[in-house]
């Protein structure tokens, strides 16, 4: 089966995470997610419900379980297929999250009360349409940080309000790249159609570091003992098991990769796009241009997502530059960076070299993203997000002292981006 005789380590691709921050503060060591009640998330609705229709929207409180587990529990309770359930976003497992789901129940009564230790139905109301991914205004977070000195409250309070004025760097966090932080590498290998290299990275031991306890299963792969290797991977390791099953049946490397669900391959392609975005953002943070325009930028309108070019002549014109600054200060617009693909509009002038540098950072060229068959097709993403309703206070409960930070973020934004700025990356995520 081996279509590549070499098992030598592949080209080393740098970290996909941002290496610079806006606040550049000295680290504050603390711990989050010691228990679900330390990480509260409340979904903010995008629209009002009408009160009638085939879809029952339910308010759910989810405690310490994964999104797929939530969907299965609700589907079984209501006697429907998981496909009949809609949701706006996926919430962190290690949290108490309040969110909406929709359940297609035409001509049927509303769901009865749910008696489950991890899922509670808070309310029900009917609507004509299914809830779709992205149909939320944002999320409200309340996070308790433990093992931290309460004396740091003034600094945290000051930094939170600075972030509310400047915006938060809109970085993709670790969860975007998988537990080995190699999702972008797998995406790159898909772009290059390096099928054997992809399998070596996913299943072997010559690429990105992996947990010590995975050595046996990865060595078994290198011995071409694919059927035996399957037994080492858990049922939840869907991609690994699918590829190994295909290999055990004599599939080529390409066929084994294509045996993996398209949704999983899309995840890795999105991770590649995210790594490129983070690299552009990193350069802008380093140059102190993350929250203002440079020549050739594409301005992103937060209401609606439209973009327009910011030319050198606009920045040189005092009146136009002042208007841009007013709109920036009001969080109406922000600079943007590409989620690279054939459908994306690229920057120009001073902005384009930064975007090309980011593509080179993952050892690719712009040409790789011009293929019309490339998916996802690409878009622009703002370099910053608005943080509203900031709060910081010290507290104590039966588990000891804590610092509580709270804030609202728009949809698609990560609370980890805020924590990274506030604590300088020294926060410890327990149970993650």
Predicted regions, residues:
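Ser/Thr-Pro-rich, acidic low-complexity intrinsically disordered regions of eukaryotic RNA-binding
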Residues: 67-72, 415, 419
């Amino acid at each position: 089966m081996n279509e590549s005789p070499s098992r030598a380590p592949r080209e080393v691709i740098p970290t996909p995470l941002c290496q610079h921050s806006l606040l550049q503060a000295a680290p504050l060591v603390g711990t989050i997610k010691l228990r679900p009640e330390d990480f509260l998330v409340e979904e903010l609705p995008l629209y009002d419900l009408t009160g009638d229709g085939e879809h029952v929207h339910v308010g759910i409180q989810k405690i310490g379980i994964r999104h797929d587990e939530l969907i299965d529990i609700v589907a079984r309770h209501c006697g429907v297929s998981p496909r009949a359930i809609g949701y706006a976003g996926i919430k962190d497992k290690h949290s108490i999250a309040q969110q909406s789901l929709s359940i297609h129940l035409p001509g049927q009564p509303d769901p009865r009360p749910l008696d489950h230790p991890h899922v509670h139905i808070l309310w029900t109301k009917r609507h004509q349409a299914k809830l779709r991914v992205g149909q939320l205004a944002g999320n409200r977070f309340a996070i308790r940080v433990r093992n931290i000195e309460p004396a740091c409250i003034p600094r945290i309070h000051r930094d939170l309000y600075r972030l509310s004025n400047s915006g938060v760097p809109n970085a993709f966090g670790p969860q975007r790249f998988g537990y080995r932080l190699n999702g972008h590498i797998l995406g790159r290998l898909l772009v290059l159609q390096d099928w054997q290299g992809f399998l070596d990275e996913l299943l072997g031991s010559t690429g990105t570091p992996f947990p010590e306890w995975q050595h046996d299963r990865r060595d078994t792969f290198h011995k071409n003992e694919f059927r035996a290797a399957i037994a080492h991977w858990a049922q939840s390791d869907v991609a690994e098991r699918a590829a190994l099953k295909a290999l055990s049946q004599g599939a080529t490397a390409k066929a084994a990769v294509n045996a993996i669900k398209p949704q999983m391959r899309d995840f890795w392609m999105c991770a590649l796009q995210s790594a490129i975005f983070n690299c552009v953002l990193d350069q802008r943070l380093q140059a102190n241009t993350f929250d203002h325009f440079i020549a050739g930028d594409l301005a992103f309108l937060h209401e609606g997502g439209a973009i327009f070019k910011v030319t050198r002549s606009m920045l040189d014109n005092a009146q136009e530059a002042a208007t841009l600054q007013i709109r920036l200060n009001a969080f109406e617009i922000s600079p943007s960076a590409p989620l690279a693909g054939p459908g994306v509009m690229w920057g120009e002038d001073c902005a384009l070299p930064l975007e090309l540098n980011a593509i080179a950072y993952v050892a690719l060229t712009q040409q790789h993203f011009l293929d019309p068959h490339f998916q996802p097709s690409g878009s622009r993403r703002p370099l910053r997000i608005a943080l509203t309703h900031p709060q910081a206070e010290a507290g104590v409960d039966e588990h000891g002292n804590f610092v509580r930070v709270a804030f609202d973020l728009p949809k698609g934004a990560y609370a980890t981006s805020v924590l990274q700025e506030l604590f300088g990356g020294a926060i410890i995520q327990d149970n993650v």
